[in-house]
Each structure stands twice: as C-alpha cells, then as structure tokens.
Amino acid sequence: MGCTISTTNNAPHSPRQEDAPPLPPQTRQSFVGVVNGLLSDLPKRRRRGGLLSDPDISLAGYLLSKAVIGDPVEPQDIPRLHKANNTVQETRARFPYGRGNVATDIAVSDHASSQHAQAAHDVFVDLVRGAAPASMLTNPTLGHAVVSEFVQGGHCAGYAAVATMRHVQKLQPEESVHYVQHNHQGHDWAESRVPDGHHKTIVLDPWAQGPAVLASDSRFAANAQHTQERLALNAKDGDDIAAKTAAGAQYLLENCLPLTETHLKRLKAQEFHCAPEEVWQPQPVVSDAFRRRVRQGLATLTNSSELGLSQSEQSSKALKKMSIKSACALGFGKKAASAAAEDIAAAAYQLGEQSQ
C-alpha cells in the first residue's frame, strides 16, 4: 500500500537527493530579491486574481517554468495537464487533515493527519478480515481509495489510489490511468498515459508539493525503469469504477461509521504519532534537476536588460508577458490572465525554489 504504516520497510525521512549545486551567490541574491518582491504582497494580489484558482495558478506557473527553460509544453498536452491538475486538487480536498506521514501536515493538524491515516489502515484491515463487498477486495486500489476518502486519512498510497479512481472517470478513449510505485523510494502516485510514449506521460501526485507535471520533470517518475505499475485502467473502465466506488462508499456509510469513530477515538486517546523514521519532509513534485533549470532560467531573465530598461523593469515585462500567455493557454481570457500574472510568476519562482 505504498507508504504504509508499519514497523518494517519504513519510508525514509527524505529520499535521495539529486546532484543540484547552488547558484553562484551574485545570481542567487538577484533571484531571491525578485522572489521576495513577488511574494511580499501575494495574499492581497491573489484576492484580486479573478477567475484563476490557486491550482490554476500553480499549473500556469509550471507552464511558465517550462517556457522559461526553453522546453515549452506542447499545446495538445495542456488540456490533459489541466484535467490531471483538477484531479490532483480534488484528491487533496478529500484529505482535510493532510498527509499522515508529512512533517508539516502532522504539525498543523496536531497529529490528526497521522491518526486518520492509521484509522484508514485499520478500517481497511477490518474489511479484509470481515465481509466487505467483493469489489473492494478484488480491486485493493479501489478499496483503499474508498476507505481513505471515507476516513479522510492516508499516506501517499491513499492519495494515489483516490487520484487513480477519480481520474479514470475523466479519460478520453485513447487515455489510460495507472497506479505506479517507485522501486526504491517507497512512494506511490498515479499517471495519465497516451500511446505516444513516456514523454507524454503526466504525473498526478497529490501527496507531493506542486501541480500535475510531465513525467520527465518529476522527482519520482522521470526514470520509468525505477517504477512498477500496479494497476492500469482505461476509459471503458470509468462507468464500472464509478458504480463500484459509489457502492463501496455507501457500504462504509451504512456499516463502518461506528467502527471508524472507535478507531479514531482510540488513536486520539493513545496520542498516536507517526513513527519518526516514517515521517517525510514535504517533497516537491518536480526533480532537483528541473528546479535548478528553472532557477537558472529565471535568473537569466532577472539579469538581462534591453532597450534601455533596467533589469527589474525588463524582468517584470518579460515575466508578465509569459505569465499571461501561460494562463491563456489554460483557456482563461486575457483580462483574468493579466490580473493573475504576478501570482503566476510567483508560482514559477516557488516551483524553482521548493526544497525539502
């Protein structure tokens, strides 16, 4: 079940770092200055952002990052990214207490995220030992997704299961969704694929920090040889999965509410905490190599000047134009895109700066 609750095969505190040496001090100072300027009044500007939601801004920031490094997302892939990003956001919304094994969520929730994750695990075990619907047992990923949503708790495996089951209902005929595990890092996520190859694969990792991204840019999925597929579904499975998910949720509501409450009360009374060796620091969805390329690309914009404009004026002008283009690529009008332009630029800087 991925990052499971166990005393064996514990997930590492943080995964292996990629080689990403820091930027030169002068370049980094310039970079950080622009970041601080963009972020200083971000909450106030975001309230005026109009029609772009936070997930839209995050995805537009990724599109901007790709453009900045000279590797823009192909137009035909953007609708799939947008759809996948919506699934990522929908999945995160199903876990109001946060991730059960991520330090920041544990702290904010005062360990409630860990208690709900453990309760979800315990309820699932009880179902396996009891008389759960056959569909929840013959398809463990579906069962895991239904239980995780019901208990509102999980680790990466629960998040990946929910994303997989939600996304299958959105697939076009040529698309498929896959539940994937890393062979070495103890991490699970979902992928949206088309027949064109790995370079078109989109990673849906709601447990990680960031939007849906192309697999080539991701922290865990970039090398397909290091991963294994545990479940594959296509568009024809959508209606069946939707029906079985609804039936499973109804079964839990009618039969498992007292059981769930009992587990949660017990765990709270015991002051259950996730074992320290199983706690992860927040993981960026993108790789260290991608983050470095973004930092370098943005720093190049920051340090360039043309037409007599100052560095800051030129940087602001270029970033705003590219930010507007990124939002328009997601289907937003120019007015909404312009209103959110600085937020999108800030999202790109944050994507480049994400650290563990």
Language-model region placement:
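A structural boundary/capping signal
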Residues: P12-P15, P24-Q356
